[in-house]
Each structure stands twice: as C-alpha cells, then as structure tokens.
C-alpha cells in the first residue's frame, strides 16, 4: 500500500498521465458501457432490499450455481454450488485459503513480480513466502528455478495470470509443465502441494 500512496503523491506532482500504477490493480480505463448499463439495470429493476442486503456466508446461491455451471461446462467437472465460496476481492479469498492450508514453518511459492501483499497474507499464517524469479524476457515461470525452490516444506504455489503487475499470461505449456513438476514433487515428498490462482 505504500507504493500506492507514493503513486498518488507522484500523480499530484507530475500528472496522472505520467504515472503508471502497477501497485494494487486499480483500473486505469473506464468500465465498458455494458458494465455500467448492467449496474444501472440492477439499481432500477432489482429488489432494493435484496440488492443491498447480506447473502449467505458462501455467497448468493444463484451466482454460485452459475459459476459451477460455467466451470463444469468448460472443464467437464461435476461441481455443485456448494463447492463454490464467493468473496469480495482476492485479498479475502487468499487470506481464507492460506489460513486454511498453511501451518507455521511451511512455505508458499510466488513468482516475481507478484502482488506485494502476498507476503503479508502468507507470513500472518506463520509460513514463509519463497519468491521465485520468472524468466527475464517473457515473465513465464523459470522451471529450473521453480524446481530448485520446491522442498519438503512447500505447501502451496500462488499463480496470477494475467499477472499483476507484469500483465503476462502464462502459456498452456507453462501451466502444464508446472503441474507435471508439482505432481512429481508431491510423490517425492508424500503430501499435496496446492495451486492457488489469484
């Protein structure tokens, strides 16, 4: 957040058009008209009590069902709405999942560059962030460095694609190699290594 505040200061000093904010993923372009229209439609035509009220802890049942239907259609899985847990933003999702799976002394890998708050989320569990440098020119995962970073304490890997802040999208080949390597390491160490997608 310090970088975000520094960016705001520089915008005031030299103009917003001269500062490129890669800190916390705030948009730099207006929302598409279709998004604005959908919001206006909700405000004008949806039950205002329901719109501004709380949902169940897991999130709105209809939204969770829509998400599970989409995932099932795309990937051939058999998820139900009960497999889906909705949150307001990645920070709460990451905090929940990391607190659920990480134990003190374990390690979680992230690929550089990464969202700086990953370190805070991981370290609050008593675990350690292990930063693995990405390939210099492409920002894809450097598989040799990745393999060297995995050990018996590795419990999770956070991937972010499109990446914040680089914007890189991991290729299918990169993801497949990563998964193959993790399956190999799970067998070697005898425990699961979770992939967390942000």
PLM features: residue spans?
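N-terminal small-domain helix-loop-helix segment of the aminotransferase-like
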Residues: 1-89, 96
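Conserved PLP-anchoring active-site segment centered on the Schiff-base-forming lysine
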Residues: 100-121
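Active-site phosphate-binding strand-loop segment of PLP-dependent enzymes
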Residues: 135-198
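Proline-centered loop/turn at the N-terminus of a beta-strand
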Residues: 18, 107, 128, 155, ...
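A short helix-loop-beta submotif of the ANL/AMP-binding
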Residues: 123-130
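Short acidic capping loops at alpha-helix termini that bridge into adjacent secondary structure
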Residues: 78-84, 105-107, 153, 191-192
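Short beta->alpha connector loops at strand-helix junctions that form conserved
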Residues: 112, 131-136
